[in-house]
Structure formats: C-alpha cells, structure tokens
Amino acid sequence: LKSSRGFSISLGVAALNTSIAAPQHQPDFEASKIMAEKGKDGETVLVGDFPFTDRLRQQVKTLHLFELQRVAGRTPPDQWDDILGRCSVLGLTGTTLLTRAMATYLEKAPQAYTVIIGPTTPLSPVLFSHGADVLAGSQVVSPGPVFDGIRQGMSFREFKKLGIQFVAWSKDTI
C-alpha cells in the first residue's frame, strides 16, 4: 500500500480486503440510496462517475460531479475546493486511495457525511477514524467463477454477477 505504483497499491488493497470482513449483520442498503437520503436538502459531491450518477442527480438537491474525464454534467476542477468546504455529502470512489487523493478530499470536507464507494473500497475500519462514515465495497463470495471471468477479460460489470457480493459498513455499527 505504500508503493507509488498503482498496480502495486491495487494488489495491496485486494490483499487487505481478503483479510477484513465487514460485520455480518449490516443493514441492507446501497451507497446511492444513502447519499440520496443524506443529500436531499444540501450539496452532494460525487468523486467519480458511477452507473447511478444520473439517478442520484434527480434525487439530491444539488449534485457536483468531480470527474477528470470530460463527461456531461461534471463540475470544473477550479471549483472543487470551494464546493468541498461546504458540501453536506461526499461520495468518493475507492480508487481515490489508489491515486493518493482520498486524504485530500477527506481533509477538505470534514463536515460532510462521507461514503467510500466501489469495488476498490478498502473494507478497513481505519477509514472511519479518518472521516469516512460508510464503506460500500464488495467481496468475492465465489472465487472460481470470478477468477474465470477475470481470466477471460471480463469487465467488473460483467463478472460481478458470477460471485461478487456488495457490502456496506457504517461506522455507526462499530
């Protein structure tokens, strides 16, 4: 995890996730639903473009999409710092840990209810002490079919149906 190389960091996070399991009796909730509920009256920041982005935009008062790729509806990067200082909800892709940007986002939005989202989310309770409120990631429950899908070059969206379980862990339950 201390490497400067993205691939090495990814392997470190994957290894970490194999050794840490979220508590078994978590409420059944999705990251996008939590963000919609928490963001209905304020400003929501979503770092990374997710399949639920358009739906979330309809469910919150204001959605700011922080995305480096030029996608429709993204917020210009020169506005990010100001928005982070006042947002009420912050959704971060777990990839921000790999790119070394997570700490910066957490420091600039200490007031925000923060959800870390996606298959690269480290399911480590350490993140709760650094500002995360919810860890919404995934675990492999059927390794054989998932590994076969990876070997065949399937995308995550394709092989997740083969044996991936989505999990969400709230700091309120620890």
Q: What is each model feature region?
A:
Residues 1-51, 150, 167-174:
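Electropositive, gly/pro-rich neighborhoods at or near active sites that engage anionic ligands
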Residues 52-83, 88:
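Histidine/lysine/aspartate-rich catalytic loop segments that bind and position anionic ligands
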Residues 61, 109-113, 132:
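A short helix->loop->beta-strand "cap" motif at the edges of active sites that frequently abuts
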Residues 45, 89-93, 115:
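Structural motif
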Residues 26-32, 69-79, 97-99:
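Active-site glycine-rich loop that binds ribose-phosphate moieties when present
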Residues 42, 88, 133:
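Conserved acidic residues
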Residues 115-174:
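C-terminal functional extensions of proteins
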Residues 55, 59, 101-108, 126:
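A short acidic, amphipathic alpha-helical/loop segment
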